[in-house]
Design a protein with these regions (language model features):
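Patatin-like phospholipase
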Residues: 1-37, 45-152
Length: 152
C-alpha cells in the first residue's frame, strides 16, 4: 500500500508538523507522496531529505534574528519575513539543506502557489525544487506581508 502526507501551512501549525515529521523519521516511516503548502512545504522538504530536526531548527533558532522576521525587513524589503535569509542564507550556509538526499529520495513531492494573474493554483514537483528554493518562497509568500514571487 502506498502512503501520502498532506502538510498544512501556518506558522504555529508548521512547528507542530515539524515535530510530527521528526517522529516519523525516528520511527523510520517514509511516505511515498508528500504535498505541502507554505510551512507544510518547507517542513516537507526537510522530511523528504531525511533531515531530522531541521524543520524545527529553521522555525525556532532564528526567530529572534532580525534577518528572519521583523519591522526592519518590512521597511527595507517590503516583506515582514526576510525571504533571502530564510531561503538562501539558512539553507545554503547556516543550516544546509541536503538537496542531493531530497532529489535521490524516491518519495514524490509537490507544493502549490497561487498565480496572482489568474487566481489558479500552480503546482511544483520535486524536479522544480532547485538550490534557489523559489518554489518554496512562492508557496510561503503571504499577500501584504511579503513580496509576490516571479517564478517561471
Amino acid at each position: 500500500m502506498k502512503t501520502g502526507l498532506v502538510l498544512e501551512g501556518g506558522g504555529l501549525r508548521g512547528v507542530f508538523t515539524a515535530g510530527v515529521l521528526d517522529a516519523f523519521l525516528e520511527g523510520n516511516f517514509h511516505a511515498d507522496y508528500v504535498i505541502g503548502v507554505s510551512a507544510g512545504a518547507a517542513n516537507g522538504v526537510s522530511y523528504v531529505s531525511g533531515q531530522k530536526e531541521r524543520g524545527l531548527r529553521t522555525n525556532t533558532d532564528y526567530l529572534h534574528d532580525p534577518r528572519y522576521m521583523g519591522l526592519r525587513s518590512l521597511l527595507l524589503h517590503r516583506s515582514l519575513f526576510g525571504m533571502d535569509f530564510i531561503f538562501r542564507e539558512i539553507p545554503q550556509h547556516l543550516d544546509p539543506f541536503d538537496y542531493q538526499a531530497f532529489h535521490e529520495n524516491p518519495c514524490k513531492f509537490w507544493t502549490g502557489a497561487i498565480d496572482i494573474r489568474t487566481g489558479e493554483t500552480v503546482y511544483f514537483g520535486k524536479e522544480e525544487i532547485g538550490d534557489d528554493l523559489e518554489a518554496l518562497r512562492a508557496t510561503t509568500s503571504l499577500p501584504l506581508l511579503s513580496q509576490p514571487v516571479a517564478y517561471q
